[in-house]
């Protein structure tokens, strides 16, 4: 490189040599060969510059001469450099080549110009020996600071000690596995260089404390082996480091929990357990889902007069919410935090977790009270909390008008909606039956390649909640807000369904004219998903929404087709029974003619709303790889459809299959409480089904056969009682009322009439 220096108004040129790769325009130039002269020097006389270069003949002799004059320390550094390069090439190169995050696009070596090896060698030797001098010294950029490793260990590692740099000062985006491998390399080199022998405990602890906890988890066996080789006992701070690394993550396995218990026993042998030890111990039990062991730990703390800290309360609350799913105990612990002392006052994170738990258990009013309490205390709210409140309010008839208000508060804070917020927008619009807005929001997700399974499920849910305009009595929730009106209008105007994205089969219209539009588009979308994303279709909640579309839009033929094509009975665990089917010839020929005519009309109507590609796929696919196994909720929908469309044959078919489902492994895997709840729900829908068909005696027989098992109430028996009154069956109506009274007293603790009279007589008023 040539630089121009002005001094005493006389310009002069100074050469600065550097190693660089020229551009392709310079690669075809022939390299000029300089005749051998004296060793490198530069003489400036009258503006003339003379520069000498070492030739190939003199290179060997000069290298030997320089190396003989080098001090011993520099020779050691050169040796370490060669060793360092060799070790790095063996350990890191193969993994970096296979790692997509760290591999860079390498240029073709055939296109690179030849590099002056002589000049590069001179520069390296000059930098090490300090003999290289330039007329203008330019300080090189400082390297990133290395880890503060103790000097004793740094001497054993040599140049390998510079392999790792702190995460905050490192500009490289190495994956976590690569960093862990680097630490393995470092520990391996230290083990070969003498290990931990001769090092003080303080030096060893300082070195191991530099390992990030997320990487330490996989290095614990190596470290324990190094202590064993050095015949040293592991001090309790190192054991605690092991425990902290093992408690990372959402869940802790039983094997990891055994190690944690073992390490805590070793710690207790060396020192008394402190508050931070108990905090970590309780956190580990929570993540291992053993909340019953926490009471024993708290009792042990009480005997040692150790006060329960805020962190312990926080871990217990989160354990009840996310691991035990015990909402009431979570609320009790949360209230204890608020009223116990000032030190244990819950922060915004605990408030957020409890609010989420309230929304999960449909206690929207309690969630809103906690939200306003949080704001009154001056705590910060976040985007996820607001979007979760919006989703919870949309489920409540009382607070559903506030749903969009919480979402628009996100924009008021200046936050950009994240993926969770966008999914909750889809959910609120879908639950409200606003198919047009849901389609537009999903179209936006297609444009940004951010479609998730949850978003797709909400799109199908919107079709199942659709109500034709002439039947809808309420306005869409988003239209009750001025900001919502502008938001909806802008979204719909910004979407052009005539331009499909990724082949997604939206019909080319932003307006939904009638129910046939919904049936046709949902069928086309299902066919597209079968071909492109079949893994989406194995979710029972998604299939339930897809089947409900035909149920809500009064199309039994389409409902039965979707029920059979999108779900199947999982026969795992069902005992095989030999069945004999007797088919009797039908004698009513006119009935067959009418049936054939009805089937022809039905097929013509179905051809409009059913995707032809889906029909072809169903004919060619015989297995259940694109179907979801049926659960109790799907059987409830099926028996409800049989009663709504008054199809006795389909009801008998579902009733028989539901009995087989109860013998399957999927039903037996449920808890006894859940099994009882599912059976009671199906029995309630069965009573409603027989009542809709005017089979009141059959409906009453279902109630009478399970009077000792199920807590029948007016919620399930009201339909049967009203139907009996309309048909003039007063005896049946009286019997139904007696069943309701008996079960309410037995299962709900309602006071009997005679007991109430006795109570009033004793009270005197």
From Swiss-Prot:
Keyword RNA-binding applies: no
Keyword Iron appears in the UniProt entry: no
Biased composition (Polar residues): 592-609
Swiss-Prot/TrEMBL GO biological process terms: mRNA processing; RNA splicing
Subcellular location: Mitochondrion
PPR repeat residue intervals: 274-308, 309-344, 347-381, 382-417, 418-452, 631-661
Swiss-Prot/TrEMBL keywords: Mitochondrion, mRNA processing, mRNA splicing, Repeat, Transit peptide
Region described as Disordered: 26-67, 92-114, 585-609
InterPro entries, per the entry: Pentatricopeptide_rpt, TPR-like_helical_dom_sf
Sequence ranges of Basic and acidic residues compositional bias: 42-56
Disulfide-linked positions: none
PROSITE patterns noted in UniProt: PPR (PS51375)
Other remarks on this protein: Involved in mitochondrial-nuclear incompatibility, a major determinant in reproductive isolation between species, through hybrid incompatibility of Ccm1 and its interacting partner 15S rRNA between yeast species.
Family classification: Belongs to the CCM1 family.
Function: Regulates mitochondrial small subunit maturation by controlling 15S rRNA 5'-end processing. Localizes to the 5' precursor of the 15S rRNA in a position that is subsequently occupied by mS47 in the mature yeast mtSSU. Uses structure and sequence-specific RNA recognition, binding to a single-stranded region of the precursor and specifically recognizing bases -6 to -1. The exchange of Ccm1 for mS47 is coupled to the irreversible removal of precursor rRNA that is accompanied by conformational changes of the mitoribosomal proteins uS5m and mS26.
Record-given protein name: Mitochondrial 15S rRNA processing factor CCM1
Organism: Candida dubliniensis (strain CD36 / ATCC MYA-646 / CBS 7987 / NCPF 3949 / NRRL Y-17841)
